[in-house]
Every structure is written in C-alpha cells, then in structure tokens.
C-alpha cells in the first residue's frame, strides 16, 4: 500500500511540474518554452525513479502522456503569437528535453528486475513510435493563435 501511495505521489508531483510550466508559459511567455527541457526531465526522473509498483509499459505511457500533455498545452495556450518560427523553437526545446527523458526512461526500465525482457523491449520501443505519431499528427497544432498580456 505504501508503494502505491509513493507511485501516486510521484506521478502527482510530476503532473504538477508540467502544469506549473504550462502556466508559466501562458502568463510569462516565453519562460514556459525555455523551461521545457527542465520540466520534462524533472517529470521523467520523478516517474522513473519515484515509482516502485508500476510496470514498465505504464511508466512509459505515463511519461509519454505528460510529455504530450505538455506539448499540446504549450502549442495551444502559451503566450505570444504562434507562428512557424515559434513552433520551430518549441520543437527544439521539446527535443532537448525529449532525448534525456528517453534515455532516463530506458535506464529506469532496464534496471527494473521484476519484469521480463519482452515487456521491457516493448516499453522501450513504443516510446519513440508513439512520440513520432504524435508529432506527425500534431506538429502544426496551435499555429495562428495569439495570447498577449501587458507584462510579457
């Protein structure tokens, strides 16, 4: 029971980090975009090393869910004018956080002694496949939006 509470706590804190960064991006642009790598790495570390009872597939899906939530949130609600130049910058910051997040996820999954290699392999392979699918479908999401406040 204590491990399940630790898992819930880690995932909740990781979600809070992502939401905080999205709020920073909305109200204090471009801070949220610039802190994307930091937020993604912190969320990944919290989930990979802070959970004890989750299977590798659920670890991968939880991390991917938060990364995709962060990406969609920034593309739709980040402050400023959303144009192609900003989208390129956002994708650069996304990949600067995505690569270390993937490496940390692989390390955490491989270190897990409770599961077999088939499940570990599937968990490692679906991360880039699902992320590539997301970027293929939603790479232009949010173009043309405009959010502006006097203080940013």
Q: Where does each model-flagged region fall?
A:
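Short juxtamembrane and helix-loop transition motifs at transmembrane-helix boundaries
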Residues: 1-4, 15-29, 50-58, 82-86
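Alpha-helical transmembrane segments
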Residues: 6-22, 59-67, 127-130
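Juxtamembrane "helix-exit" motif on the non-cytosolic side of transmembrane helices
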Residues: 21-28, 71-83, 137-145
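Alpha-helical transmembrane segments of polytopic membrane proteins
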Residues: 22, 29-43, 86-101
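Short, aromatic-rich membrane-interface segments at the entry and exit
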Residues: 27-39, 55-59, 118-120
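Canonical alpha-helical transmembrane segments
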Residues: 37-61, 69-75, 104-108
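Short alpha-helical packing/oligomerization segments
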Residues: 71-109
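C-terminal membrane-adjacent module
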Residues: 101-152
